[in-house]
UniProtKB/Swiss-Prot annotation:
GO terms for cellular component: mitochondrial inner membrane. The keyword Mitochondrion applies. This is Mitochondrial inner membrane protease ATP23. It is a peripheral membrane protein. Belongs to the peptidase M76 family. Its main location: mitochondrion. Coiled coil: none annotated. Keywords: Hydrolase, Membrane, Metal-binding, Metalloprotease, Mitochondrion, Mitochondrion inner membrane, Protease. The active site is at residue 142.
Length: 241
């Protein structure tokens, strides 16, 4: 039967998905499902949606403990994180470091790795962080936001200012390194992968801003500040990750 005559398979609504049975979440069966998800072989849209829900909602206490362990290591040994922490401390009038209790791991109900709020600090979403190295990138990203907020008094409700700090955070954190993009998008357009990743992430973040009315408005904000913000590597001398 040709694919054009097969009934379309649709993913279930996220509100209708519940956590799978324990037998599906551990051991060989979880390994099998993970392999199928990574390869895409025989994976239906509903199975994909179920796996993603299960991944982000299973073993939450264990993931939070792992996140805290990774955070301790990154704060102690990551060159980029320690560099950012040092420069943020220099901006602090009291010359005090970022309080450890202002960087927390917790379960999140939004689909991103972390966030920064000037009144509360940095949140690392333990149920969305897959590795120590991903946590390092996410924390470095959020620390760029902290630095920009302290040095430039960034107003996140100004879309151009928001776009600028997002461009800088994705550029300096390492999350857009070419190898990461090659794994996601292949070898095509190799020379532009770094910039395309930064632009894509910045547009998505600005589009999610409550004062942004459309994707087009987000793209315009990013375009307007792109050249100046992409070339601003402070406090680094250059992009090295």
């Amino acid at each position: 039967m040709s694919s054009s005559t097969q009934p379309a398979q649709t993913s279930p609504s996220p509100s209708k998905i519940t956590l799978s049975a324990d037998s599906q979440l551990n051991g060989f069966e979880w390994w099998r499902r993970s392999l199928q998800y990574q390869t895409g072989l025989g994976l239906t849209p509903s199975e994909k949606a179920q796996y993603e829900y299960d991944y982000f909602h299973r073993n939450l206490d264990q993931k939070c403990d792992t996140c805290n362990d990774h955070l301790k290591w990154v704060l102690a040994y990551s060159p980029s994180v320690r560099f950012m922490m040092d420069h943020i401390q220099k901006l602090n009038k009291s010359n005090e470091p970022v309080p450890r209790n202002k960087i927390v791991c917790q379960t999140c109900d939004f689909t991103k790795g972390g966030g920064f709020d000037p009144n509360h600090g940095i949140v690392l979403c333990s149920n969305y962080i897959r590795s120590k190295w991903q946590l390092e990138d996410i924390l470095a990203h959020e620390l760029v936001h902290v630095y920009d907020y302290m040095k430039f008094n960034v107003n996140m409700l100004d879309l151009r200012q928001h776009a600028c700090t997002e461009i800088r955070a994705s550029m300096l954190s390492g999350e857009c390194r070419v190898w990461n993009e090659m794994k996601k998008t292949g070898m095509g357009n190799f020379g532009k992968k770094f910039q395309e990743c930064i632009r894509r992430r910045a547009v998505l973040s600005v589009e999610a801003n409550p004062v942004c009315k459309s994707r087009e408005e987000a793209e315009k904000a990013v375009d307007v500040v792109w050249k100046s913000c992409f070339n601003d590597t402070r406090p680094f001398e250059r992009v090295y990750r």
